[in-house]
Amino acid sequence: MASTPPQTSKKVRNNSGSGQTVKFARRTSSGRYVSLSRDNIELSGELSGDYSNYTVHIPPTPDNQPMATKAEEQYVSNSLFTGGFNSVTRAHLMDKVIDSDVTHPQMAGAKGSSCAMPACDGNVMKDERGKDVMPCECRFKICRDCFMDAQKETGLCPGCKEQYKIGDLDDDTPDYSSGALPLPAPGKDQRGNNNNMSMMKRNQNGEFDHNRWLFETQGTYGYGNAYWPQDEMYGDDMDEGMRGGMVETADKPWRPLSRRIPIPAAIISPYRLLIVIRFVVLCFFLTWRIRNPNEDAIWLWLMSIICELWFGFSWILDQIPKLCPINRSTDLEVLRDKFDMPSPSNPTGRSDLPGIDLFVSTADPEKEPPLVTANTILSILAVDYPVEKVSCYLSDDGGALLSFEAMAEAASFADLWVPFCRKHNIEPRNPDSYFSLKIDPTKNKSRIDFVKDRRKIKREYDEFKVRINGLPDSIRRRSDAFNAREEMKALKQMRESGGDPTEPVKVPKATWMADGTHWPGTWAASTREHSKGDHAGILQVMLKPPSSDPLIGNSDDKVIDFSDTDTRLPMFVYVSREKRPGYDHNKKAGAMNALVRASAILSNGPFILNLDCDHYIYNCKAVREGMCFMMDRGGEDICYIQFPQRFEGIDPSDRYANNNTVFFDGNMRALDGVQGPVYVGTGTMFRRFALYGFDPPNPDKLLEKKESETEALTTSDFDPDLDVTQLPKRFGNSTLLAESIPIAEFQGRPLADHPAVKYGRPPGALRVPRDPLDATTVAESVSVISCWYEDKTEWGDRVGWIYGSVTEDVVTGYRMHNRGWRSVYCITKRDSFRGSAPINLTDRLHQVLRWATGSVEIFFSRNNAILASKRLKFLQRLAYLNVGIYPFTSLFLILYCFLPAFSLFSGQFIVRTLSISFLVYLLMITICLIGLAVLEVKWSGIGLEEWWRNEQWWLISGTSSHLYAVVQGVLKVIAGIEISFTLTTKSGGDDNEDIYADLYIVKWSSLMIPPIVIAMVNIIAIVVAFIRTIYQAVPQWSKLIGGAFFSFWVLAHLYPFAKGLMGRRGKTPTIVFVWAGLIAITISLLWTAINPNTGPAAAAEGVGGGGFQFP
């Protein structure tokens, strides 16, 4: 279904007389699918090396469904879905995903009791609660293969000899009498005209109208897809239940979920005053400098005044947005009371929190170790949030089998790790970080079995790491064995057909999965349709959606007793979007947009949290912290919550300012008081509706049209320019994706539990269980990750992550702010997320180069803040303008760093003499700088050493990476030269003797040339001036000190760079000192020969003395 044209898809949906077709096929070694009849299928297992597929042609309908819903979901979760451009979407049923055994009932490949068919040793599938899946009402136990055979032959159940029917005996009809309905019931006119106003509205052509939710529906909403209760569930009972839920909420004293805490006036008032004072002093100083040129060295004066004017402008752009810093706090107890507490209308305490989809992206398992990614996934699966509301998606842009099987191993290990974390309240929930803690693990632990459980889980984790580390060799050995078998088969066939035995056998070197079938993604030996840039779309539900009710473990199932612990796991999906030559894949932004579409169809969480593969959840309550802002009064106009980035593995001195606390604790906190922090690429919780490119709601305007504040709104209410004909142009032709948009919008609203909440949803709206997955839904999600789906749509232009820049994160956040949304900065007491950062000098410079290049691209694009709309606040506009301009400071910074050396070489200075006026201005500017630094340290919480490290790195990166970024950006604009970057290598967390080994590795790069030249020239200039001074008959030391001071100031900023060049202490190559000394002596002798000392007369005239006088 997913590969058919969109219009065909709609027509098929309306054909209620057709059932789902299951098509068997054999995949040959060449990659073709050959249809098989029943007579050609041998039950001896000869197909073990080929694909056994069923092709989804027609979705099941309420009138003709081949098996029970939960049974179908189980079969779907055990299938690897593939598809894409000009290919049919296929579901490959897998006997096993990994070589090791699978025990958790939610995981693909989980087996139940034995099959009841004669001469069959297969196992029955398990549902999410560990019970056997039986497709027929007679409860006849049948395995997957026998069920497929029965379906293909007669369609009859082998037990009762009846046709497979709708029904799952384990399912109970949901009871909505408690009032837990998402929206008020439709009006009587709608219920009375079922023929004219059908739930499945059709357009004039008789096709399914995929815009019904966007423009005409006043239906109810559930978690995931839309849920319409039965007609008899509407009426007085429902109304009373709804009113009861509202009354219960209204009776409780209203408390806010978050608070805005202003900076104390004793700190912020002097800070603002100093900014004004320094601005005034700077203006007077620059005026004085312009009016008092140095006639003896006009070229030196002109260069210095141009640089100083730019520095003043740059300082204004950086400092003015810091006028309004704020702090925020959250109240998790209030969140729990509002959304998770039992009540008369919710006796089981089912959560009313909205769902959230967590995205993790990876691209190359060689540079991003699978163990690091697996630990990130485990921290997500163990997050403290309602299990049924969490869905995790991994985007593998490389399509590597190594990543696939590593994620399957992580899902298997989560069966033990996640319940262990819940049972003993473990923090952090990244196993590698937890077992690496240098503190007493028994601190604050009171359960008597903790030590025993920890010992067991540590052993299991060690075995898990060994399995992950052994995956490359395991895959290689497996593939070699299967390829050798295929070569022998091909050779045998060639001999039987009479071919020339001397000719080499041409069999592709395929990569094979654990169940003995070809991997549809990238092969180790890349071939056509199996390389990083050319492979089919792949989607595997590693962990199917959990049940709505807790699944309590027991002491017999696991190595650890979980008899009082919920053992459910969140849904986990592996996604590798389709890539084909000739299609622009748009790097990480394209991968994120593919996840947005796939997740909208599978889970449709109204909020999305994206993480890099090396950033894990350090605070298991981080999601709840973010929800306190989204669900609070006024939270409906928040587009995203940005969490600060914190890093591990940084050297104690933070030589290269990796922690970047000045930015994360200073600039971002200040922007939070304006319109919100910028999006920095990871650790961000998005509102899905904002990602779709819509404007924020205007409650006053919307309430003029709506009678009820909790009534469903149409998309045209948010975007008047969006009509029916523009919907496919903006979002594509996916019907399910279009239907999910207003559902996500509604579920993302705050509770309407306060009169001030003008735009909310009723309490209890999100307690409805989610719909199970079916083949049609998963096939549609494969369709939307195809390479052609975004053609002629607004994905990447207005919708989703924005394309066109290597820093797509900043542009995406800018677009949201430009539409009027605001963002919030969430700093928690315990770090929410932690990740790794490059501590090697060269890697750090390349990282900054990528960021700066993206800023230059922004400056030369339509995303320049100068062109922003009126919805972007003035201070926010200055902040975004600074984002695009700051790399250009490098042009003036490099020149200014050479000025002290030019002064010492020429004997002149930027001013004629060190007059009282110059010194007073210099002193006042310095005092203001120190005062601003001290006060900024006070309100931001950073340290003075961190502030100084940031200043040092600003000069180092400004004279290297930023300069190269400007050159690359200009070349791209003028000559159209595209910019490409290699993926930053992540640390694999190996147990090295020195965890800071990368810090001492010297990797040569052209980015090092400018700082080296600056340092050498200033050192030589000091040496030359020193030698010239001592050769004078009457040495003028004051002149030397005055000129050398500014050179030493430059060298002090370059000190971390010099340490990075020296590598490990005591291992500096001798040749470096030899050449440095020779160069210095040569230049000194050359300068002495060109400008020799002429004796006392020359000294009296000040020849070679530095060119300026102390007053």
Curated annotation (Swiss-Prot):
The keyword Membrane applies. InterPro entries: Cellulose_synth, Nucleotide-diphossugar_trans, Znf_RING/FYVE/PHD. Its EC number is 2.4.1.-. One of its GO terms (molecular function) is cellulose synthase (UDP-forming) activity. Residues 192-202 have a biased composition (Polar residues). It is found in: Golgi apparatus membrane. It is a multi-pass membrane protein. The chain crosses the membrane at residues 266-286, 297-317, 891-911, 914-934, 963-983, 1007-1027, 1040-1060, 1070-1090. SUPFAM superfamilies: Nucleotide-diphospho-sugar transferases, RING/U-box. One of its GO terms (biological process) is pollen germination. The active site is at D397, D809. Its main location: Golgi. Keywords: Cell wall biogenesis/degradation, Glycosyltransferase, Golgi apparatus, Membrane, Transferase, Transmembrane, Transmembrane helix. GO terms for cellular component: Golgi apparatus; Golgi membrane. Residues 1-26, 175-202 are annotated as: Disordered. Pfam families: Cellulose_synt, zf-RING_4. Thought to be a Golgi-localized beta-glycan synthase that polymerize the backbones of noncellulosic polysaccharides (hemicelluloses) of plant cell wall. Belongs to the glycosyltransferase 2 family. Plant cellulose synthase-like D subfamily. PANTHER family: X-BOX TRANSCRIPTION FACTOR-RELATED. This is Cellulose synthase-like protein D4. It comes from Arabidopsis thaliana. The gene is CSLD4.
